[in-house]
C-alpha cells in the first residue's frame, strides 16, 4: 500500500472487473539438490493480521511522509491505480516530497484477505480518514484494496486503489475533484506483458456477459472464490453477492469496450490487468461513465479466471 491517493466521487455505475541440458558429470549433485528442493515444505501462507500490520505501517508512513517505506516495502513492479490510470513506484516516492498533505487521523476496519494462489494476497478494508492534500479534503470513507506478493522470503506491496463509499442513487452525474492533488503524474506507456492479450480477451468476455445479464457465462468466466469493490465503494465478499449485483436489472447497456490494457504477472498463476472500461447505456438512471478497472486473474488449467476487481471513475 502507498498513499498516493486519488480521491474521487462516484459517477455512474459500471461493471467491474526454456530448458537447458545439464552436463552428465553434474547430474548426481543436481539430482540431490532437486531432491532437497522437492522435500522442502512450501512456505506458510501469510496471516491476515501480519499483512494488515504491514499495511498499517504503510499508512503511518503516508501520514508522516516517509517515502522509505515505499522503497523498502513496495515491489519494483508495483503501482497504484487512480482516476488517471497507473502510477508507478518512482512517482509514488516523488509525491512524498512534492505533495503537501496534512493527515490528522485515519483508521482501518472490516479487513478481509483473499489468496490468489500461494504467493499473492489481496487485502480489502474500509478506510476512514481526516486528511487534506494540496488543499483538497479527502473523502471521509473509502473502500480500499491492497495487494501483496511474495518476493523471496518477504511480502511486498504491489498494488493499491480505493473507491469512495457513496450512495449510488445519490451520486452526482460526474466526478468531483480528484483526491491526490493537482500534481499531474505523467502518463507513461506500460510495456505489455506476454499474457496481456489473453487477459484482455477474458475481460472483454466478462463485460459482454455483464451487458447481457448472463449469469451462467459469468459463472464460467470467474473463479470459485471472488470478491469485488464497485465504483460506489460497495464491497461484495462472495460470488453469490457479486453475481446478484452484476445481473440485476439496474443497468441497460448496449455496447461495452475494454481499452488501454496492461497486464503484470504477479506469480506464475496470477496476473493483474488494468484497463479503461466503457459502456454505452445507463445504470440506475444515470449515463455510464468511463472507468479505470483493475482485475486479478488466476490460472485454472489453460484458462484465466477472474477472481477480484476494483473500479474507479476515469478522470
Give names to the regions the model predicted:
Residues 74, 84-85, 112, 119, ...:
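A mature extracytoplasmic/lumenal domain signature
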Residues 93-141, 243-290:
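Surface-exposed, charged secondary-structure patches
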Amino acid at each position: 500500500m502507498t498513499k498516493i491517493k486519488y480521491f474521487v466521487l462516484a459517477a455512474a455505475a459500471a461493471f467491474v472487473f526454456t530448458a537447458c541440458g545439464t552436463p552428465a558429470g553434474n547430474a548426481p549433485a543436481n539430482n540431490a539438490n532437486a531432491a532437497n528442493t522437492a522435500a522442502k515444505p512450501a512456505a506458510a501462507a501469510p496471516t491476515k493480521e501480519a499483512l494488515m500490520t504491514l499495511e498499517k505501517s504503510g499508512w503511518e508512513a503516508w501520514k508522516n511522509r516517509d517515502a522509505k517505506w515505499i522503497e523498502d516495502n513496495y515491489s519494483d513492479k508495483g503501482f497504484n491505480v487512480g482516476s488517471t490510470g497507473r502510477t508507478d513506484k518512482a512517482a509514488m516516492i516523488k509525491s512524498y516530497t512534492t505533495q503537501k498533505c496534512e493527515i490528522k487521523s485515519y483508521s482501518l476496519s472490516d479487513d478481509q484477505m483473499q489468496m490468489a494462489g500461494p504467493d499473492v494476497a489481496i487485502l480489502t478494508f474500509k478506510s476512514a480518514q481526516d486528511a487534506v492534500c494540496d488543499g483538497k479534503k479527502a473523502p471521509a470513507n473509502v473502500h480500499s484494496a491492497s495487494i501483496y506478493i511474495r518476493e523471496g522470503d518477504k511480502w511486498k506491496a504491489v498494488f493499491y486503489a480505493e473507491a469512495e463509499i457513496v450512495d449510488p442513487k445519490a451520486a452526482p452525474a460526474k466526478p468531483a475533484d480528484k483526491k491526490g492533488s493537482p500534481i499531474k503524474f505523467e502518463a507513461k506507456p506500460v510495456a505489455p506483458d506476454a499474457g496481456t492479450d489473453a487477459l484482455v480477451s477474458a475481460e472483454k468476455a466478462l463485460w459482454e456477459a455483464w451487458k447481457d445479464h448472463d449469469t451462467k457465462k459469468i459463472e464460467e468466466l470467474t473463479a470459485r472464490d471472488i470478491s469485488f469493490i464497485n465504483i460506489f465503494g460497495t464491497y461484495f465478499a462472495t460470488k453469490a453477492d457479486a453475481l446478484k449485483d452484476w445481473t440485476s436489472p439496474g443497468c441497460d447497456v448496449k455496447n461495452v469496450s475494454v481499452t488501454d490494457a496492461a497486464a503484470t504477472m504477479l506469480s506464475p498463476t496470477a496476473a493483474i490487468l488494468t484497463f479503461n472500461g466503457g459502456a454505452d447505456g445507463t445504470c440506475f438512471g444515470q449515463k455510464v461513465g468511463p472507468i479505470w478497472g483493475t482485475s486479478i486473474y488466476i490460472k485454472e488449467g489453460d484458462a484465466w479466471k477472474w477472481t477480484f476487481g476494483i473500479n474507479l471513475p476515469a478522470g
